[in-house]
UniProtKB/Swiss-Prot annotation:
This is L-rhamnose mutarotase. Belongs to the rhamnose mutarotase family. The lineage of its organism: Bacteria, Pseudomonadati, Pseudomonadota, Betaproteobacteria, Burkholderiales. It comes from the Bacteria. Its EC number is 5.1.3.32. Pathway: Carbohydrate metabolism; L-rhamnose metabolism. Keywords: Carbohydrate metabolism, Cytoplasm, Isomerase, Rhamnose metabolism. It is an enzyme of class 5 (isomerase). It is found in: Cytoplasm. Substrate binds at residues 18, 41, 76-77. Homodimer.
């Protein structure tokens, strides 16, 4: 398992809509994320800057690089494109974050 983190940007005034859409995330998308090796995925918001900070844990043999090929993933990105910053192909703009510190319980 490894953990990655990245930053995205939410458009102003879209917090409630972003939360609503994620509360109603499509079961097919959840299944595809799990099948790709995603084991834990959390997104946090800095309300002052509208930056979203995502932390994702995935299996060592993950296949996340194939997610953009999936119709349901593309459909989700199209669905989210009106409320966040995206590239011309409607994928969310993401900036990888560099890990600087980790604290784990000795039993891990």
């Amino acid at each position: 398992m490894d953990t990655i983190a990245f930053r995205m940007v939410l458009n102003r005034g879209m917090r409630d809509e972003y939360e609503r859409r994620h509360r109603e995330i499509w079961p097919e998308l959840v299944s595809k994320l799990h099948n790709a090796g995603v084991r834990d995925y959390r997104i946090f918001l800095d309300d002052d800057t509208h930056h979203l900070f995502a932390v994702l844990t995935r299996t060592a043999d993950h296949s996340m690089e194939r997610l953009p090929e999936l119709a349901v993933m593309r459909k989700w990105w199209d669905y989210m494109a009106d409320i966040m910053q995206t590239a011309p192909d409607r994928t969310p703009l993401q900036q990888a974050l560099i890990p600087l510190f980790e604290l784990q319980h000795p039993s891990n």
